[in-house]
UniProtKB/Swiss-Prot annotation:
One Pfam short name: Ribosomal_L10
UniProt-listed PANTHER family: 39S RIBOSOMAL PROTEIN L10, MITOCHONDRIAL (PTHR11560)
One term of GO molecular function: large ribosomal subunit rRNA binding
Organism: Anaeromyxobacter dehalogenans (strain 2CP-C)
Species lineage: Bacteria, Pseudomonadati, Myxococcota, Myxococcia, Myxococcales
One example of a Gene Ontology biological process annotation: translation
Record's protein name: Large ribosomal subunit protein uL10
Gene name per UniProt: rplJ
Cellular compartments per GO CC: ribonucleoprotein complex; ribosome
Keywords: Ribonucleoprotein, Ribosomal protein, RNA-binding, rRNA-binding
This protein's record includes keyword S-adenosyl-L-methionine: no
Family recorded in the similarity comment: Belongs to the universal ribosomal protein uL10 family.
Function as written in the Swiss-Prot or TrEMBL entry: Forms part of the ribosomal stalk, playing a central role in the interaction of the ribosome with GTP-bound translation factors.
Subunit structure: Part of the ribosomal stalk of the 50S ribosomal subunit. The N-terminus interacts with L11 and the large rRNA to form the base of the stalk. The C-terminus forms an elongated spine to which L12 dimers bind in a sequential fashion forming a multimeric L10(L12)X complex.
HAMAP family per record: Ribosomal_uL10 (MF_00362)
S-S bonds: none
Length: 174
């Protein structure tokens, strides 16, 4: 790779690192091409970048970005996973991926400007994602309206039952 290509890679990585809400630094050892391709596809479908990076280029690209505090963890084989919207989805996808693979290790992460260790990423993976949270919030907003409709309708239903029971009682009496 010549100097121009390196500068281009640094510029591209810097731009992505600056936009990232979550950046996870991982160590992808002993993974075959098919497994990595499958992981890349899952991450790409979720609009998450997965890059195997040259450590010196990544460290230079990290300068002046939210990823800079973890640049010292760019040692050995390094994969960089970056998300620009949702911070939970990359953690969930990587935690799911790691269940079957001991070789893939999360070193550290930056989540919305905060340094998080591997345990923190695992804990984040257990939280509901953005879509699930939106669904829960919508259900919570709709719930009071549903309860109110039931409460408003209940007295009328009870009155109708009382009138119906009294009507049946009078018919039996004759």
């Amino acid at each position: 790779m010549n100097r121009t290509e390196k500068e281009q890679v640094i510029g591209e990585l810097h731009e992505k690192m600056a936009k990232a809400k979550a950046a996870i630094v991982a160590e992808p050892k002993g993974l075959n091409v098919a497994v990595v391709t499958d992981l890349r596809k899952k991450l790409r479908d979720a609009k998450i970048d997965y890059r195997i990076v040259k450590n010196t280029l990544a460290a230079r690209a990290a300068k002046g970005t939210p990823v800079e505090p973890v640049a010292d963890r760019f040692v050995g084989p390094t994969a960089l996973v970056m998300s620009y919207d949702d911070v939970v989805t990359p953690a969930k996808l990587l935690a799911d991926f790691m269940k079957d693979r001991e070789n893939f290790v999360i070193r550290t992460a930056i989540i919305e400007g905060k340094v998080v260790d591997a345990k923190g990423v695992q804990a984040l993976a257990k939280l509901p994602g953005l879509k699930e949270l939106r669904g829960q919030i919508a259900a919570m907003i709709a719930q009071p309206a549903t309860k109110l409709a039931r409460l408003v309708g209940t007295p009328g239903q009870q009155l109708a039952r009382v009138v119906g029971a009294r009507h049946e009682q009078l018919e039996k009496q004759g």
